[in-house]
Amino acid sequence: METLQHLILHDMPNSEEIEAVKSGDHTLTYKGYRKRINQLANAMLQKGIQKGDRVALLCKNGHPASTVMFAALEIGAVVVPVSWQLKPYEMTGILKASEPKAMFYGAEFKEILDEVLPELSSLCVTMETGTAYETSAEFEALFAGPDHLPETEMVSPDDTALLMFTSGTTGNPKRCMITHGGIYRYVKKSNSSIARMKGLRFLACHPIYHTSALICIMLGTFAETTFVFTKDQDPVHMLKVIEEEKIQTVMALPVFYTYLLEAWEKHQTDLSSLVILMTGGTKVPSSLISRYLDIGIPLAHGYGSTEAWGISTWTPDMGMDKAASAGKPVAGVKVKVEDPLTGEELPQGEIGEIVVHTPFLFKGYEDNPEATAKVLQNGWFRTGDSGYVDEDGFIFITGRYKDVIIYGGDNVYPDQVEEVIQQIPGILETAVVGIPDPLYGEKPKAFIVKNGGQRITEEDVIAFCKERLSAYKIPEVEFVNELPKNNLGKVKKDVLRNQAVHS
């Protein structure tokens, strides 16, 4: 059966020698990990959790979180990863909508859940797991039972495995139904990724509610990767973990790597164990990739979405001249560019909407057929991203369609302006949005976060841009302490637009 459940039941590693997960002082081999997953799966069945039931997961990165996830999937339950950045009001809304039967949560979230749990009439089982490093006695008691494979009802490839939430930058988050078959095909077709992760020591600092974090866990587990979990992303602590644990690969957002590099330049820890770093989730500045290559560390990045999972990847061996691209489609994925108004396929090099056909595609937004119909058309997924494919087959993303700035009839793509600004030394991150202009309709404005006490002026930024961009692309500049972001780490450009209009 081509399902993720079947993979967990029959193909999960069972080695007594290879370390599977490490949280603090606790280490499990794959054999011990396999045993605990089975024990928890059997305990879930005893508590009445069955195929199709929703199991919400609110835990910091650690072996309790991954064990709960695999145990639930093994019995055919639907895992609902919950962001720990949400406020009680937001969390209540998404959990009410997803109707979990069970909730597993870390001890640090007890206070927020005291407000949330009474609102959830669907809940039958609640379990505090302890912390990422120390499990609670109540949770540990679940592992006293049998460790044989659970006798459970088998799922079909079209059954939902994960209920993920979109970033919700334009309103309430939509619930993406990710199927067992889609994840199965992703694992089976990702031979090169699995080979690259085979036996590596992986620093699992990327929050487990991110799609990219889950992709790494799924692929890495079946590649016998060792996951060293950390519950936060403090760069100085991360450098220490990399050195002491001989970490070979990491997955994180681009801004994390900026902070990490700045910390390394101060502390000069040993990074010689690193083989490759991975990032994605937002545009990756070519300057950041170059800075890592300068110290001998390749930084690869990928393009994808919650709905489509991995779409394309770029690695340094593809050439720095393509570093600003989103790479080439992964195995099994087809990409075309269409006119968003007519649906006509556009020729090579022309900017339009990126549309993909992929065997890993979600099956729709739960209880939202209208939103589903807008993005799923004849087996193709409309990403909402504007971009083009060049003569070598590389995908270039120029922005979100709703983010494109129309300056007197000329299109300004925020990603292009952001890419230029990110090249300025001392810039931590930036976001470019369109603001009203009485003469041209819209004009670009850049919100910029400087790195520490760097002395960079508006004039410096504008002069730098004038050397590299057409006159109509030169933005207004405003320095800010931080950029507003949603719980997935994506910049909330609508907030910046409103801020600019009402300032």
Curated annotation (Swiss-Prot):
Its EC number is 6.2.1.-. One of its GO terms (molecular function) is acid-thiol ligase activity. Keywords: ATP-binding, Ligase, Nucleotide-binding. It comes from the Bacteria. Transmembrane segments: none annotated. PANTHER family: LONG-CHAIN-FATTY-ACID--COA LIGASE, NONRIBOSOMAL PEPTIDE SYNTHASE PES1 (EUROFUNG)-RELATED. Belongs to the ATP-dependent AMP-binding enzyme family. This is Putative acyl--CoA ligase YdaB. It comes from Bacillus subtilis (strain 168).
